């Protein structure tokens, strides 16, 4: 019984921390600098790999991706997007995650995080970026349901937009502009 209380208390603390992070995103004026997104993504992935040393994930990060933005907020964004890709590819022998840049026909630059993980039903894509909305059970994939809401807020603070595509069992693709 005491163990359940401890776990519940720890989870509540994590949730409060996540909510505080979400609330802070909208307050401070972002400090805009040149951010090497490729290097930042590599740091995030290294941290994920260190936390699960036995796990093998094929990760491809396009070199030379830069953006103007708040480094701390963009780190939070990549921690959430790449962390989700890492989490939702768990259990796959051939887990793959990509972080690339695409230039659309009109010249707009999109940054893309793609994985071959659990994916999601495209009918529920609009719910992905709302706080506390989860498309997978807590038992299957732990989380608070705040990460993608934070990502959306960060993207919007940078004047960008975000969209998601997915297919159950085939993975997810999240694209954003800054």
Predicted regions and their residues:
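Conserved catalytic submotifs in the C-terminal HATPase_c
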Residues: 33, 53-66, 102
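Short alpha-helical segment of the dimerization/phosphotransfer core of two-component systems
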Residues: 7-12
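Short conserved segment of the HATPase_c
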Residues: 120-132
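Short helix-loop "hinge" at the ATP-lid/N-box region of the Bergerat-fold HATPase_c
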Residues: 85-89
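Detector for a conserved hydrophobic position within an alpha-helical segment of the HATPase_c
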Residues: 155-156
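Short alpha-helical Gxxx[C/S/T] motif in the catalytic ATP-binding
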Residues: 5, 147, 151
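A conserved beta-strand-to-alpha-helix junction within the catalytic ATP-binding
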Residues: 31-46, 98-101
């Amino acid at each position: 019984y005491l163990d359940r209380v401890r776990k519940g208390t720890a989870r509540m603390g994590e949730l409060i921390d996540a909510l505080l992070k979400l609330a802070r995103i909208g307050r401070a004026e972002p400090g805009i600098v040149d951010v090497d997104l490729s290097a930042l993504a590599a740091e995030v992935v290294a941290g994920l790999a260190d936390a699960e040393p036995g796990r093998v994930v094929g990760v491809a990060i396009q070199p030379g991706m830069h953006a103007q933005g708040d480094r701390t907020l963009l780190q939070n964004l990549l921690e959430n997007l790449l962390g989700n890709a890492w989490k939702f590819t768990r259990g796959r022998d051939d887990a793959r995650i990509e972080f690339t840049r695409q230039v659309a026909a009109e010249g707009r630059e999109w940054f893309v995080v793609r994985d071959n993980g659990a994916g999601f039903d495209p009918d529920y894509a609009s719910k992905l970026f709302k706080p506390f909305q989860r498309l997978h059970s807590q038992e299957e994939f732990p989380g608070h349901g705040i990460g993608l809401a934070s990502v959306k807020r960060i993207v919007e603070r940078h004047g960008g937009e975000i969209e998601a595509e997915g297919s159950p069992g085939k993975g997810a693709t999240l694209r954003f502009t800054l």
